[in-house]
Curated annotation (Swiss-Prot):
Residues 478-541 are annotated as: Disordered. The gene is dscA. Glycans are attached at N48, N71, N115, N126, N148, N166. GO terms for biological process: proteasome-mediated ubiquitin-dependent protein catabolic process; protein ubiquitination; proteolysis involved in protein catabolic process. Disruption phenotype: Impairs growth on solid media under hypoxia and leads to triazole susceptibility. Impairs virulence in a murine model of invasive pulmonary aspergillosis (IPA). It catalyses: S-ubiquitinyl-[E2 ubiquitin-conjugating enzyme]-L-cysteine + [acceptor protein]-L-lysine = [E2 ubiquitin-conjugating enzyme]-L-cysteine + N(6)-ubiquitinyl-[acceptor protein]-L-lysine. This is DSC E3 ubiquitin ligase complex subunit A. It comes from Aspergillus fumigatus (strain ATCC MYA-4609 / CBS 101355 / FGSC A1100 / Af293) (Neosartorya fumigata). Residues 1-22 form the signal peptide. Residues 403-429, 475-550, 596-608, 664-802 are cytoplasmic.
């Protein structure tokens, strides 16, 4: 085999991996980069020269930064109203905790003289965590002029006037992810401030629903729990404006000094970095965005509420001890960490709207007030516990699957199992793992995730796939037979001119020696040995090719479904929710293919009952958790209706399987709707062999059985019974014990109705089985025998699977 192409391909890949990834910038790029650095140096100088009160849009005071100039036509007239709502939320948070708020909070004119950084509250000093809460759109008191989008598009070279991140709808849900650490921090006698970054997902509650993702950077005052966040882009230099958005002069001074230090370090780092088209990198280590598009800018005021333990205000030293134990656990006797609670006001200066969280007294407590969520340490702990539970679920599923594989160790038992039932289970395992990895990978250690991934690989790609391949190979002849029946070969005319005489037969051997057939009517071995071997070899090769095609199709369908499912995150919320519920319904229908195969094959006991019940409970667990627990780690909206519907659907399927096991696989299927299949549990009735119709199933004359009746009709214990009903006793050739079977009266005899007789004998029929060759055995004996071979124990004739 020629491998020169592969060698050259690997050589090129090796060269690309070892080659330097950094290239000197082009001359035009270097000049643009120098101009960009000069502009940013000038902006930093202007920030250093500014002072508190320089930015006052109602007083016609503006800043020289992009987005805060007078001719930018932003709706800065809404800023006082947004700040008023933020002050109101601060007062409510202090009052609800049982503390007395400063009186100067009521008077906006007295705010500049207020020392907000000295307002010490019992709050978490590290605000890193994940929070969720409902929001409403605030109705503005007056109309403001619309943004001059044409001028902005011309200034920045945008190819469209459509703004992204324009939040619509009157209500929805906030999903806030706060991250501290790795940024600048400033500690002085007057207070403390540090950098913070956040990601805000805004979900609307309109009909289709939409979700917007906003990246934010800002400052956090740990002593008071106040946070100011802003977006940043080439048309809005939000980081330079942040200090001027503070409520008091002391907060301005702290944030002003912090940002001067941080932005100076960032600019120094940027001078040594390859060029980028993004005009400003917000924080050190933040991601850069090349080719920005126009979008709505946002400013967010967050206020953390004082921590309460069992509805009592916590002391500040206790809160510090809780935080210390969370970050460096040593087993200290501290109370469990309460959830973080925050109020939020979201203000868009260019798109002109205000969003705020629900709070008292405007909304009752039953509405789900404020933003609530665990600190990141608690969230990581909950996530790790969930992954551990998922690992336990996978381990239990693997155990049940191994038991079922051991039970279905013969071709007879494997032919009863539906391939699509096992395939749906494997699909579900793969989906559960991949989406948990996508959502919880940053919160859970690599070792825990590797354990879950290994168990899933074991369940899907090793044990499950091996079982599916065995089932697929065993059922290959059945599929080929169905294809032959659906596509019969076209008849070809004889090549000879005249047909043979009716009394003649084609001569196969012209020798004088006659052909003597064996008693079992088998053809001569020398004539058919070679074709049989050739046919067996071709059938085995065809089966191997069929299994390989199934393997490729399985992973192709899995890959396509994963791509579509990941793409569904970008769909409108309602459409994505409908897709997720439809996918869950299809996945939890894994018993439906088995029910259908039981009907087609007319078989009852295909799966172990511990496998059926165990898999049903284990595979329902993730759906019940995420759809019923409000504080689940993925912040999925509770939907008990869907949870109960999915659980009820699985319950119905299990009951149908149980009914098929007791009443028969086709008890609810009208006669003629399913293909004909042999019934191993016919009703025995008085009559001679001429009335036998074995293929029809249902009723079999007692005289058609090839067994010795040991009892007759004159047994003493049967004399008390009705004349139209008796029992017969036969020998089971497997266990050598007697079989006692009920025998109904012959047709036309006087007695009870056939409906009554059939109802009373439906359970007793399950104790015996009659083969197509008319031999009778105990059900348990013959089923055990048929697990090993599909031959009659007496006459060795082939018999169909149960």
């Amino acid at each position: 085999m020629d491998n020169r192409g592969s060698f050259f391909f690997l050589l090129i890949v090796f060269y690309l991996l070892l080659s330097s990834q950094s290239r000197p910038p082009l001359l035009d790029q270097d000049r643009e980069r120098q101009r960009e650095v000069a502009r940013e140096r000038d902006a930093l100088r202007l920030l250093n020269e500014s002072k508190y009160g320089d930015f006052d849009p109602p007083g016609d005071k503006w800043l020289p930064f992009a987005g805060t100039r007078k001719n930018d036509s932003y709706a800065w007239g809404i800023l006082p109203e947004a700040q008023g709502r933020a002050r109101h939320q601060l007062r409510s948070a202090i009052s609800n905790a049982g503390l007395e708020p400063p009186r100067s909070l009521e008077d906006p004119d007295a705010l500049p003289s207020l020392n907000l950084t000295q307002l010490l509250l019992p709050v978490y000093r590290n605000a890193t965590g994940k929070l969720r809460g409902d929001w409403v759109r605030r109705k503005l008191n007056k109309e403001y002029p619309k943004l001059n989008t044409t001028a902005i598009a011309l200034e920045h070279g945008y190819f469209t006037h459509e703004f992204g991140l324009n939040i619509t709808g009157s209500s929805g849900t906030f999903y806030l992810d706060l991250r501290e650490g790795g940024g600048e921090e400033l500690r002085v006698d007057s207070g403390q401030v540090r950098e913070i970054r956040a990601t805000l997902a805004v979900e609307s509650n309109d009909f289709w629903g939409n979700t917007w993702y906003i990246s934010l950077f800002g400052v956090h005052f740990p002593e008071t729990g106040a946070i100011i966040l802003s977006s940043n882009s080439e048309k809005f230099e939000g980081l330079f404006v942040l200090p001027h958005l503070a409520f008091s002069s002391d907060a301005y001074e702290l944030s002003h000094q912090l940002l001067l230090n941080s932005l100076s370090d960032t600019l120094s780092e940027k001078e040594n970095r390859p060029p980028t088209l993004f005009p400003w990198s917000s924080l050190i280590g933040s991601e850069q965005v090349e080719f920005p598009a126009p979008k709505c800018e946002h400013i967010i005021y967050l206020q953390q509420h004082p921590v309460t333990i069992h509805d009592y205000l916590a002391d500040k030293p206790v809160v510090d001890q809780i935080e210390e134990e969370l970050r460096f656990p040593i087993g200290a006797p501290v109370p469990p960490a309460p959830l973080m609670v925050m109020s939020a006001v979201v203000f868009s200066p260019d798109c002109g709207y205000i969003l705020e969280t629900k709070g008292t007294p405007d909304f009752p407590p039953s509405e789900g007030l404020y933003l609530t969520g665990p600190k990141i340490e608690e969230y990581d702990k909950y996530s790790a516990r969930l992954v551990f539970i998922i690992c336990g679920v996978f381990a239990a599923q693997i155990t049940l699957l191994l038991r079922q594989i051991k039970e279905a160790s013969t071709p007879s038992t494997r032919s009863r199992i539906s391939f699509y039932t096992i395939a749906l289970m494997a699909f579900g395992d793969a989906f559960v793992l991949i989406f948990i990895l996508l959502e919880l990978y940053p919160a859970v250690s690599f070792l825990v995730m590797a354990t879950a991934a290994f168990l899933t690989f074991l369940s899907v790609s090793y044990i499950g796939m091996k079982f599916m391949m065995e089932i697929w190979a065993v059922q290959a002849p059945e599929r080929r037979e169905q294809e032959r029946r659906s596509n019969p070969p076209a008849s070809t005319p004889r090549s000879t001119g005249l047909p043979l005489p009716a009394t003649s037969a084609p001569v196969r051997d012209s020798g004088a020696t006659p052909i003597i057939l064996t008693p079992d009517q088998d053809p001569p071995a020398e004539e058919d040995d070679q074709p049989t071997n050739r046919g067996t070899t071709s059938a085995a090769q065809e089966t191997r090719n069929d299994v390989g095609a199934m393997y490729a199709r399985f992973y192709f369908v899995l890959f396509v479904m994963l791509i579509i499912s990941i793409w569904s995150f970008l769909w409108p919320n309602r459409l994505g929710a409908l897709y997720a519920r439809a996918l869950a319904f299809v996945y939890l229908s894994f018993w439906t293919p088995q029910i259908g195969r039981n009907i087609i094959r007319n078989c009852r006991k295909a799966l172990r009952w511990d496998f059926v019940i165990g898999q049903s409970i284990l595979r329902l667990f993730p759906f019940v958790y995420f759809l019923t627990v409000r504080g689940n780690v993925l912040f999925i909206h509770p939907d008990t209706t869907t949870a109960f519907a999915l659980a009820g659907w699985v319950w119905i399927q299990v009951w149908v399987l149980a009914s098929q096991d007791i009443l028969g696989p086709r008890f609810f299927v009208p006669r003629g709707w399913a293909p004909a299949a042999y019934d191993y549990h016919p009703i025995l009735r008085d009559g001679d062999e001429s009335e036998a119709d074995l293929e029809s199933g249902g009723v079999l004359p007692i005289g058609a059985l090839r067994a010795e009746d040991l009892s007759g009709d004159a047994k003493d214990e049967d004399k008390q019974r009705t004349k139209d009903r008796k029992r017969a006793v036969f020998d089971c050739a497997i266990c050598m014990q007697e079989i006692e079977v009920p025998v109904l009266a012959a047709r036309g005899s006087a007695g009870g109705s056939s409906v009554t007789e059939g109802a009373t004998s439906i359970l007793s029929r399950r104790t015996y089985m009659v083969t197509p060759c008319r031999h009778i055995f105990h059900s348990t004996c013959l089923e055990s025998w048929m697990r090993l071979r599909l031959q009659c124990p007496i006459c060795r004739e082939s018999i169909p699977p149960v």
